[in-house]
Design a protein with these regions (language model features):
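N-terminal Rossmann NAD(P)H-binding glycine-rich loop of SDR-like oxidoreductase domains
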Residues: 10-14, 18-22
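Conserved Rossmann-like nucleotide-cofactor binding loop
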Residues: 16, 42, 75
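Residues in the short beta-alpha loop(s) of Rossmann-like NAD(P)-binding domains
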Residues: 14, 37-40, 98
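Short acidic low-complexity segments
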Residues: 32-33, 50-64
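Extreme N-terminal starter segment of soluble prokaryotic enzymes
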Residues: 3-8
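Rossmann-fold NAD(P)-binding glycine/threonine-rich loop
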Residues: 76, 81-88, 95-106
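NAD(P)-binding Rossmann-fold cofactor-contacting core
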Residues: 27-48
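N-terminal Rossmann-like NAD(P) cofactor-binding module of classical short-chain dehydrogenase/reductase
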Residues: 69-70
Length: 106
């Protein structure tokens, strides 16, 4: 059986969970961080997470089929990321808390 490396896009890469997740990815043999982003104006934009520079372009997280967006951001950001995931056909894992009933229904 051939092993596939799962490509990960990480919004909120500079946050507490983002840093923890990027560390776990760095120590994994079957995951690779391929995109990282922070909100516009964040002092983390341009800094490196491993070999990846943190971007402020959310669209860069839509890495396509075979990739996964791992989201632990804020509800408003999650909804934007969900649209990006749908359009780019990127799977998404949502760990964001505080979603409204309407947001969860969407």
């Amino acid at each position: 059986m051939s092993e596939q490396i799962v490509k990960i896009a990480l919004p909120g890469a500079g946050g507490r969970m983002g840093q923890m997740i990027s560390s776990l990815i760095a120590h994994s043999d079957d995951m690779q961080l391929v995109a990282a982003a922070e909100r516009k104006g964040s002092p983390m934009v341009g800094m490196a997470v491993g070999d990846i520079a943190i971007s402020d372009d959310e669209a860069s997280l839509g890495i396509g089929p075979g990739g996964v967006i791992v989201d632990f951001t804020r509800p408003e950001a999650t909804m934007t990321l969900l649209d990006i995931a749908v359009v780019s056909k990127t799977a998404m894992v949502i760990g964001t808390t505080g979603l409204s009933n309407e947001q969860e229904a969407e």
